[in-house]
Amino acid sequence: MKSAVETLSPTRAKLTVEVPFEELKPSLDAAYKQIAKQINVPGFRRGKVPPAIIDRQVGRGAVLDQAINDVVPQKYVEALQANSLQPLAQPEIEVTKFEDNQALEFTAEVDIRPEIALPDYDGVEAQVDDIELSDADVEEQVEALRERFATLIDVERPAAEGDFVVMDLVATRDGEPIEGAEVSGMSYRVGRGGMLDGLDEALVGMSAGDEKTFQSELVGGDMVGEAVDVAVTVSQVQEQELPELDDEFAQMASEFDTVEELTADVRERLGRGRRLEQAAAARDAVLEQLLDRVEVPLPEVVVTDELNARRQNVEQQLAYAGITMEKYLEDEGQTMEEFEADLERRVRDAVAAQFLLDEVAKKEEFGIDQAELSEHLVRRAQQSGQDPQEFANHMFEHNHIPELVQEILRGKALARIVEAAVVKDGSGNVVELKNLRPDGTIGEPEDEIEAETEIEIEPAAETDTEADTEQ
């Protein structure tokens, strides 16, 4: 077999392959055997029909077509390997020349992984915002803790913002109740929002026993987004009574003996959270700085596939939440054109980052072992609220392990870049990145996967996996 490659663009190549007729013989023999099992010829047992009889009964052309369908994919893969090409999608194959007893020629156009000239990624400089933690932030968290231990007291007065009401809701259209669009005995905090437009305004001023009708739009079901009349009936108005912020409350709500200790712990927890946020921002800023130094050609097929996947994910999340795209765009203050432009920008940045990190992983010759794969599987399972072993089984059964391997390798590459970077905050202080895990994620040391969490890994995953896994 002979092959040649023509570069059509930095992300697309054309292979021209010539296969001598002799190399088709195994596929021709296999085609004859398969056809012999499928036809009935008087005087011959099924599967024992000679090739010459098959040529007369079925036609030599049918045998050749079957052989070509068998041999072309094999020779395409051989040509990829011979020319060190990494395909990103299915090829467009065209048989350009073939006659019986003559060489087979075909071409294959395919999107390929771009070549990237890696810049020096040691000592990348980036800047992030200062950590801001005010007394008001701490007080807000302490107040939220008090609200968790609050009691509700019935009051005989009109409801005001911040009160709780027990209510019934019934949605109607043209005077007819809408199936599934009613609730009974629901406790709701006036002013909370996020339920029905107009509900909070209707509830303010209502007393126990009052009924009121207002217009709104349904946020779920088959009639989502349609205008309806909503009747609200209040059966109770309740005032929230917060516990006193004293040592007794601290002992009830926490493991601490005093309010001072409780408040100090809240401040420390908030501080850790802000430091983690800053570390994540530093990681992203370093990657952004490195991307600015390199040109990454993007295969449009990869961008398009990722765009479609993310768009579908947004649509599914909105449908699950009972929110229309129009309502979402209104809340975000975006037009559809702005949404699409922002989505495409983020997708292109993400795809460029993936290719860049793949190259770093390849240069550093990173691999992964069974323990790392197991830990990553457990973390992913915990993030999605699934049983680790069931999650691992699903990933193996559906051949998603290469994707997880690539995630780990990219994480290692990102960690390598960030660890060598110099990141400062707005005040010029060097940002500590000790909370960066080896896989590139951010977390506290105590958040690491517990050692006793074990899952069974298939033997094929036990060997080190190199960084050249395909996109």
Swiss-Prot record:
Assigned protein family: Belongs to the FKBP-type PPIase family. Tig subfamily.
EC numbers: 5.2.1.8
Coarse class of the protein's main subcellular location: cytoplasm
Protein name per UniProt: Trigger factor
Annotated Gene Ontology cellular component terms: cytoplasm
Protein's organism: Nocardioides sp. (strain ATCC BAA-499 / JS614)
Subcellular localization: Cytoplasm
A Pfam family that the UniProt record links to this protein: FKBP_C
UniProt domain PPIase FKBP-type: residue ranges: 162-243
NCBIfam families hit by this protein: tig (TIGR00115)
Enzymatic reactions: [protein]-peptidylproline (omega=180) = [protein]-peptidylproline (omega=0)
